[in-house]
């Protein structure tokens, strides 16, 4: 196998803080090279430098033997380098077809090539739909197709399966293997060890801006990889200090009630029909299903972002079906959205402002309180930051997710709806978030958790509701929650 790209001694700083410290990295043709690391380790920054999106402070890139001090995005594309970002970046008002073919040369019948790619992926994308209507999983597939249509020799996949269902993941893996046979080199950034072992012949682990482990995947067991990412052994539970810092700010809930926090009767809306459920204080209810089953649409309707077409919603025995989003929020219904960069965070605002954005205090107490709130969640969640005024866009994906979680908790929820809360989050941070959800529920907050990673529900959810084509196909109590049963119900079968 020939060397496609080599990075030598790459250094990079943001605001005087080193994020890459002398990185060396090599990718061969036909190789899947996995890149692991905790949140803020520098993985995405390194890949953005290779793709020409960021400029290194020092170091050199060699692409098929040609040296470059830096690359520009257009130059990287011409060299066959394509980055599929963790957060899809599509033109929302263009169609799927227009997004995929944007600025692609007209020769070689692109429409036919696109049809062939879709068939190879067994992908059911509606090419005439507006990109803004797609769920995150479908947006991810559009990004991947963009790269494939540009005959990428070097394909960088940043957490490509984070929001894909098992079936979509397996189809993607088949396409990756086909690309390997064509000599395409693939950098596969993931936190999912089974996927890395299934796909990657080589693995590199980054920590604090440096490569701390690299070699053939078979050389290392899971413990070695996790230890390299997180050098300090972490308990699965939160420490007493963290629990203290995570105590919710208000006193809205002190004890469980004998009536449900949320009651929904025959609710119909965009993407779902006749849904009924009850969630009680202190209960964690999982909402499983395939992408397109209507889970996110249901959550957004509960929050008031989408209109209802029928049915009723009660929050603590108060009907809220006609309430605005702001009124529902004031009553304690808080929603953590699926796409943190588009729907969740104010990326160009400071961390302190993002953290209290849902319950802004009066101006005279604002700044002092914001600093105290950021300090609380910095300690409790381990948010990696330099200072409260740091712009959210400069944080790693996992730390952005923690800021969004902090904002939701600071809003003093009665019902917390979390949509894909661990998307793009590393192994140790996932454990923190799971324990955080348990800690919140222990304070008698009702939690509705949506996840495409079905392995998250056993041991976490008190029960799991499964959706199929906009309807509930079944409910599993804690003792019956298993991957096989959830998958069977998600495909419309029996558990």
Swiss-Prot record:
| One GO cellular component term noted in the UniProt record for this chain | plasma membrane
Pfam families, per this entry? ABC_tran
Answer yes or no on keyword Repeat.
yes
The cellular location(s) given in this protein's UniProt record come to: Cell inner membrane
What GO molecular function terms would the record report?
Answer: ATP binding; ATP hydrolysis activity
Asked if the Swiss-Prot or TrEMBL record annotates the protein with the keyword rRNA-binding, the reply is no
Ordered alphabetically, the record's keywords are:
ATP-binding, Cell inner membrane, Cell membrane, Membrane, Nucleotide-binding, Repeat, Translocase, Transport
Q: Which residues bind ATP?
A: 37-44
Please indicate which superkingdom the organism of origin belongs to: Bacteria
Q: Could you tell me which InterPro entries the record lists for this protein?
A: AAA+_ATPase, ABC_carbohydrate_import_ATPase, ABC_transporter-like_ATP-bd, ABC_transporter-like_CS, P-loop_NTPase
Q: What is its main location?
A: membrane
Topological category with respect to the lipid bilayer: Peripheral membrane protein
Stated family: Belongs to the ABC transporter superfamily. AI-2 autoinducer porter (TC 3.A.1.2.8) family.
Q: Relate the assembly described in the record.
A: The complex is composed of two ATP-binding proteins (LsrA), two transmembrane proteins (LsrC and LsrD) and a solute-binding protein (LsrB).
Which PANTHER family does the record cross-reference, listed alphabetically? AUTOINDUCER 2 IMPORT ATP-BINDING PROTEIN LSRA, CARBOHYDRATE TRANSPORT ATP-BINDING PROTEIN MG119-RELATED
**Role summary:** Part of the ABC transporter complex LsrABCD involved in autoinducer 2 (AI-2) import. Responsible for energy coupling to the transport system.
Q: What is this protein called?
A: Autoinducer 2 import ATP-binding protein LsrA
User: In which organism is this protein found?
Assistant: Enterobacter sp. (strain 638)
